[in-house]
Structures are given as structure tokens and as C-alpha cells.
Amino acid sequence: MKRIDCFEAIAGSITDELVITNLANTANEWRAVRNHEGNLYFVGMGMVTPYAFGLSMALPNRKVIAFDGDGGILFDLSILGTIAQTGPSNLCVVVLDNEGYISTGKGSHTSSLSSGIIDIAGVARASGITNVHEVNTVDDFVGVVKNAMEGDTGPTVIIAKINNEQAFVGTSLMDGKENKYRFVRYIEETENKIILKPSAREHGEPPKADPVFSSINEDDSFGEILFDGLQENQVNFVVGLPCSGFANTIRRCLDAQSIQYVPVANEGTGVGICAGAWLGGMTPAAIMENLGLYASTYQLMRGHYTFGIPLLLISEYRGDAGETEFFGDSGDMTEPWLNASRINYRLIRDLHELKPSIRDGLRWMNFGLRPYNILVSFDLTRPMPG
């Protein structure tokens, strides 16, 4: 079956669902059959499903569809486990499996792993997702999409086995940032919320009052202060990969009612999830050691910079003075990496600076629409005894 035939068959039944598409002709074909404000096009490989997942978590009463590819889902299989563990019933992931990297052009193509023994549907089931369907006809595709849109029994993953035919329908005249604005404004209008905050105040008006911070006592731990700082600055969505320096904070986030915490197996996955959460109106933060920043480079550059999406990054400074592990040596590249990546940051060496730095970082990223990093010195995250 052809991809565009699948799209044409379901386009008329899509109403207010939000759609995230992958690259090239997948995006172009969906735009050709249903050009709508609720579509975010051209999301990079390995990021489509994380974006859609984050969006579904931010808007639990709204159906979200991901049009991913076999190459894209194979790029980050760990997102399937995250979906299974969290179970958003409003999420439908469609993997358009043509067994190759085909949609990028008119020339010869390279086969993907799904052309061999890799069974994407089997991987999804083994990850813990119950509603997994592999379809080979347009009628079957229409049926499982309809069931996913009408049901609420958990997330759905559909493997649509398409051929390698493409409909060259022309490309979009929008770049990522224009598409982002259109998409977010549509969500603001239909969800009655404010997401974009380019200015903190009207001209001539005083600045918005600072958050009220609880006092810091001498025996307060770093983890406790960071958690309080997140709450007091109204951060309500946090992703993290377990890290000794952040263990106390993560434990508190897991128990908190005011914060949605999503554990991830890869920091880059978490960055993509945060992008989707922000698009849906959440105030997200990603907690990771600085080596995790390196692992997130692709997602930050290909995603957040392409679309202009802010994110508060809170990082432990591995390789800083006091480091005791040999693998921390590469940490001294952190600040040059941040500068080269054009990520604004603040280095924190005093616990009393932590809460205000979260406040200031959120303000900066709201008008800058770019990631902001709070880099916490190693002696604060892992104080030595004595």
C-alpha cells in the first residue's frame, strides 16, 4: 500500500487531533492531503514519537498522532518503553514502515533494519505496549486508526507496511519556526491557554513579581533546595535519567503531586519529550549530568533550534574540581560545548544562587525561545564529607 493512500483515507476523519510528522515526503504528503494548523511537520529522526509523547502528556484530553518511520523509531527504541511505562491513552504512534530510508529523495535508497529480522511490532509488544497492530491494507489501516481515535484503553502503536512509492507533491514554504508559531497558536486557541510569553509585562508596567522562595537552612541538602526551586518557580514537568548527584531531587519529583516526572533511558529522548510538553503548555526541565548534555546535542540542535523551543536544562558539572572518577575528564569541555552550541548558561557555585537562577533561566528562555542551562558545580551536587 502507498503512504499517500493511507493519508487520504484517514484525512477526512481527523478533526482536532494534533499531528507530529517526520521528515521530507511524509510531511509533504500529509500536508498535501490535510494542511492544518494542528500539524507540526519535519521533526527529525528519533524525535517524532518523543515529541508526540510529551505533547500527549501535556494535553491528556487531546488525541495526538505521531507519523513516524521505521528509520525514525529505530533511531530511539527506548521511547517505546517510556510509552509503555507511562501509558498515555490519547497517543497513537503510526510507524510508516517502508523498510528503508526512502522518503529523503528520488535516488537509490538504503534498507533499514526492519527489512531484515527486526520486527518493530514485536519490539513494541516486548516493550510492554498492548495495543500494537501491523497492517498491510488501507482498509485495515483506517480501521485501527479509527479505533485508536475512539478508544481510551492505552497508547496505540500501528506498524503500517507501506511500499516505497512516493507522491512528489511539492514542499512546504514554512520553516520550522513559522510552523511552531502556527501550531502553538492553534493549541492556545483551542485549549484556552497562554504558551508563548515573549514579554513579561506591558510597556510601562512594573516587572512581574518574583516567586516567593523558602529560606535555605544550613543543613538543607542540594537535592532538597533544587526540588524546592523547581516547585517555587512553577516548573511542572521534569524528565531525568538516574544520576547520583540528582538522586535526592528525582526521588522528590517522583513523589510530588505538582510535578509530572518522566524517567527516560536516554537524555536525548528526554529532551525530545520536553519539547512536546512545552508545545502543549507545560513548563519543562531536563535534569542530567553534563555528559548527558553531550548525548542530547542532536536533539537540541535538530529540534529546539530548528523550531525555536525553550527548555530549562539543569546539569551536574562532572569533571569539575573535586571530581573523583576517571570518566569525568571530558567534563572540562562543558563550557566550550555550551558556547559552541549557543546555549546560554549560568555556573552555580553557591546554593543560594540556585533558586534565582531557575527564575532567571525561565525568564530568559521564554523570550529567547532557546534552551538555557543551569550548570551546578560538582562540590554542590556531591559534597565531600568533613
What are these regions (language model features)?
Residues 3-4, 35, 151-213, 256, ...:
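Glycine/aspartate-rich loop-and-adjacent alpha/beta segment that forms the canonical ThDP
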